[in-house]
Amino acid sequence: MQVSVETTQGLERRLTITVPAESIDSQVKSRLQQLAKTQRINGFRPGKVPVSVIKKRYGQAVRQEIAGEAMQRNFYEAIVQEKITPAGMPNFEMKTDVDGQDLEFVAAFEVYPEVEVKDVEKIEVEKPVVEITDADLETMMETLRKQHATWKEVKRKSKKDDRVTVDFVGTIDGEEFEGGKAENFELEMGKDRMIPGFEKPIVGAKAGEEVVADVTFPEDYHAEALKGKEAQFKITVNKVEGLSLPKVDEEFAKLFGVEDGDVEALNAEVRKNMQRELEQTLKANVKEQVIEGLLANNEIDLPKALVDQEINALREQAKQRFSQQQGGNVDNLPELPADLFQENARKRVSIGLLLGEIIKTEELKVDSAKVDALIETAASAYEDPQEVIEYYKTNDELMQQMQNVALEEQAVEVLLSKANVKEVNKAFDEIMNKQA
């Protein structure tokens, strides 16, 4: 086998491979002889068909089959010989395939770039230092109360955050219009669910009162006939309801799994959950800064094949998410354009190559304790964490994913140890609200 390597452009390579004629011809002859023993052809006894007859009937197909196998086999032998690592599958082009002549073909493909991670010490990282205060805990408890609040009818004027039940009739130039009328319509105030100006006269009204709202439909309103039109709504308030927050007591504590209803135990559990979420957010915050700094200081050539693979993966993930949210078969969804995923795909490929180089140069090995910690963190969000942990540990694919995540985190820790890190005091809500 003769091999010549050509760099065509950037990461693109062309291997021209020549396989001796005798190698191909002998394989073709052997394959034809095997066929002669098994093929049934009229006029010949089984196993007694002359090779010349088999060659006439099957020779071209057999040669194509042998040539295809030879291209695959010799390509992989060639890249081992030349110490080349392809990024993606090759495209084969046959140059010469004639009986008695050498088989010559070209394999075009991309290679991985040479990656040298530099300027790690120039990565700037602000590491937030956060303490969960009693005030933070009180705010979280208030949030939990609001999540379990109920609507109760009140005998007072309505306020911005109330829920009102109304009848309304809309008119344009004194004439009612389609879709402008409703009875016992529940409206949660302050959510901007109605057109601008509709809620304004309702604020301050009591049940049984009638008010009038003068409005103008937006130019981008979904109903073509109403765009930009001035209208008047006569609104009758039937009921006003305010949010009733539950007391933080024994019953409230039981809602969150505290069986004995101990409020102090609830506070401790809520603080523990806040701490866990905070630690995850801080880790993600620091990791993002490290990655962004790494990318900013290390621009590398990317194999198109890897970017295309990542685009396809992102496209498939988007289709699956859409299907889960909206329902329906993903096969019926239109093909999403590659441009939607190009930037994110390039970023992900760059991160993978750079962190891969860190893992290689630092000779990092998977830290089993870190893998266990990652699994426990993932499982803690479920009702039965131990069951989830067991599921992970008996699923090879999930375990491989967690090992990859652990290695990536170890690489980030190496970068962080060399980066320019400055600790900055931050408030809990500042960090968590930024995440949201």
UniProtKB/Swiss-Prot annotation:
Its main location: cytoplasm. GO terms for cellular component: cytoplasm. InterPro entries: PPIase_dom_sf, PPIase_FKBP_dom, Trig_fac, Trigger_fac_C, Trigger_fac_C_sf, Trigger_fac_ribosome-bd_bac, Trigger_fac_ribosome-bd_sf, Trigger_fact/SurA_dom_sf. It holds the Pfam family FKBP_C. It is found in: Cytoplasm. Its EC number is 5.2.1.8. GO terms for biological process: 'de novo' cotranslational protein folding; cell division; chaperone-mediated protein folding; protein transport; protein unfolding. Gene3D superfamilies: 3.10.50.40, Trigger factor ribosome-binding domain, Trigger factor, C-terminal domain. Residues 161-246 form the PPIase FKBP-type domain. PROSITE patterns: FKBP_PPIASE (PS50059). It catalyses: [protein]-peptidylproline (omega=180) = [protein]-peptidylproline (omega=0). Belongs to the FKBP-type PPIase family. Tig subfamily. Involved in protein export. Acts as a chaperone by maintaining the newly synthesized protein in an open conformation. Functions as a peptidyl-prolyl cis-trans isomerase. Consists of 3 domains; the N-terminus binds the ribosome, the middle domain has PPIase activity, while the C-terminus has intrinsic chaperone activity on its own. PANTHER family: TRIGGER FACTOR CHAPERONE AND PEPTIDYL-PROLYL CIS/TRANS ISOMERASE (PTHR30560), TRIGGER FACTOR-LIKE PROTEIN TIG, CHLOROPLASTIC (PTHR30560:SF3). This is Trigger factor.
